[in-house]
Amino acid sequence: MDSSAGVSPCNSPYGSGLLDVPLKLRPRASHYRARSLVIGGKEHVRALPLGGDAPIPIQTMWKEPLIGADLQSIVDRLLELEQLGCDVVRFAVPDRESAELFVALCARTRMPLVADIHFDYRLALRCMDGPVAKVRINPGNIGVRERVRAVVEKARATGTALRIGVNTGSLPGVVKRAVAARYADGMQSVNARAEALVQTAFAEAAYLDQLHFDRVVLSLKASTVAETVRANELFAQQSDIPLHLGVTEAGPLVSGIVKSTLAFSQLLSRNIGATVRVSLSDSMEHEVLAAREILAECGKRAGGVRLVSCPRCGRIGFDVHAFVRRWQKELFSLKKDITVAVMGCVVNGPGEGKHADLGISGAEDSVIFFKRGKIVRRIQVRDLCADERTRIIDAAFKEELSSL
């Protein structure tokens, strides 16, 4: 037996009183639109709108433990991430000492921060003593409902948003068994696993609804594109709760970006998704830049530098790869709405790069700079050593860039 019908939150497999009150659904229109929510805004922390017509914020997660870290170094790094386009950063808070450090960190940055809590609900309570923007909990491992209620009441009192994170790896057994019984192949199909995610999410959302708490973001994550897309589609068809998009355990740089791009592009094209994180076994900077580019290509984020560059071939007259590595971070930190082209030879530049506001290209024994297809500077590099060549090229590029 297979099931292709929509998921009903009123028929949750949780049972045993865990879903006593059905979720008051606010059905979406066919174009989908999440309800509006503002996170942050407490004390000195920047207020960040999401859902509704708000731009889609980019999130990353801090990659190291807080214990033993220098807080000022973290604050400085957060500023760098913000300049690249990051809007929110989530921190793992696994113990009391980390919670104390997290509260201290919140007091020192304008960046909206999220506390990621598992197992011990008291850590969530402590984190909300500071100007935290949002607390992420997984009710599946927080414990009894009274603990979730305590978190909700503290969030209400402090004006803190909550994100309920539901992952395929931590679905309640009762949900999996109930859903598996309705499918011929049990939990093996994409639809079954997606439905289990949605049923779990609805059960948690219904409990928060029962407590009259609506400062909520939900995430339904799987490690495959198909399950992630299907689960978020099913949920979005029946609720306007803002959704945080992500593919969990997406993998290293290349495969992780591919998975996130495929999932996000399908969902964002339907206006599903209020915030995003590209989860990578790589740097936070790459997570932010990948999310930024995905949103831009999906028409969901405007402004900033658009960097185009050729892949490089045997005609190379200019080291494209090295130049991009040197300049990428600075270019993406600029607030200018421009296109920059970095080309290896005259085949691509300035011809194929003529649309760029500023371009640089190799040309036999020289490097040329062009603006909107017109050559504005040429530098002879044949007799220059590598270091001198780099210095002169970078200085000229910086001068041309500053003139835009």
UniProtKB/Swiss-Prot annotation:
Q: Which residues bind [4Fe-4S] cluster?
A: C310, C313, C345, E352
UniProt entry keywords in alphabetical sequence: 4Fe-4S, Iron, Iron-sulfur, Isoprene biosynthesis, Metal-binding, Oxidoreductase
* GO BP terms in the entry: isopentenyl diphosphate biosynthetic process, methylerythritol 4-phosphate pathway; terpenoid biosynthetic process
Top enzyme class, one word, equals oxidoreductase
Q: Which SUPFAM superfamilies match?
A: Nitrite and sulphite reductase 4Fe-4S domain-like
The pathway entry for this protein reads as: Isoprenoid biosynthesis; isopentenyl diphosphate biosynthesis via DXP pathway; isopentenyl diphosphate from 1-deoxy-D-xylulose 5-phosphate: step 5/6
Q: Which domain of life is it from?
A: Bacteria
* Catalysed conversion reaction: (2E)-4-hydroxy-3-methylbut-2-enyl diphosphate + oxidized [flavodoxin] + H2O + 2 H(+) = 2-C-methyl-D-erythritol 2,4-cyclic diphosphate + reduced [flavodoxin]
Cofactor comment in the record?
Binds 1 [4Fe-4S] cluster.
The protein's required cofactor(s) are namely: [4Fe-4S] cluster
EC numbers for this chain:
1.17.7.3
Q: Name one Pfam family in it.
A: GcpE
InterPro entries hit by this protein: Dihydropteroate_synth-like_sf (IPR011005), IspG_bac (IPR016425), IspG_bac-typ (IPR004588), NO2/SO3_Rdtase_4Fe4S_sf (IPR045854)
Q: Name one GO molecular function term.
A: 4-hydroxy-3-methylbut-2-enyl-diphosphate synthase activity (flavodoxin)
Family assignment from sequence similarity:
Belongs to the IspG family.
Q: What HAMAP family does UniProt report for this protein, alphabetically? A: IspG
Known role: Converts 2C-methyl-D-erythritol 2,4-cyclodiphosphate (ME-2,4cPP) into 1-hydroxy-2-methyl-2-(E)-butenyl 4-diphosphate.
Descriptive protein name: 4-hydroxy-3-methylbut-2-en-1-yl diphosphate synthase (flavodoxin)
